[in-house]
Amino acid sequence: RNLGIGSKLLELAEKEMRKMKKNRLYLGRDLLNYFPGLPIDLKNNAEWFEKRGFNQLGNTCDLIKIIKDKNCEKLLLRNNTYTFRLATLADKDGLLELMTKNWPGRWKEEMIEYFNNGGTGREYAIALDGNKICAFAKMGFPQTPEPLESYSLTWRNRFKSLGGIGPLGVDADYRKRNLGYDIVAFANNVLIDNNATEIIIDWTSLLDFYRKMGFEVFKSYLYMTKEF
């Protein structure tokens, strides 16, 4: 450290971004990211980035729930109108349609990569209105192989049997019906049934929403970005 290596690496990264005509650089938040921002544990390093043109834009968190009693930690669903289950390969086109309509960026790309890596659909909890997929939650099981894992399992080696939830979302036409709560509750219950001892929800600022389900802050991060 203190030899200019970090500055040179950042300079090279910025050079490549400019070649690609990009005008904004984020710290973290990339596909298969390590972190969604600068870890609060390293907040003293924020000054280093600020001296190089980065600005702070708020923060985000990873949340955790420790499963002490399987029965007590399970959650009741609020809807009986929709069907909740794990996806299969037969749901691939339906998931692609959902992502293309609502989240055509990284979530769609992550889903495509998941299936290209041999995913069967099992890591996606889905809610259906008839045959239409109207909500999803990506999950990581304690047994999920590494090529199929999401950021929610980044910390898996620190735990006995970690489960993960995220990303997740509800179709724009189905919001404000408690489907967001229910898809998380369903994923929570499935992970408990699969012997998760802890569950992490990654990269969120919805603390009040998830605290209702027993989650608390595990790690915090600073959003930092630089405009070219």
Task: Identify the function of each model-found stretch.
Residues 60, 73-109, 132-134:
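Short amphipathic alpha-helix that is part of the acyltransferase structural core
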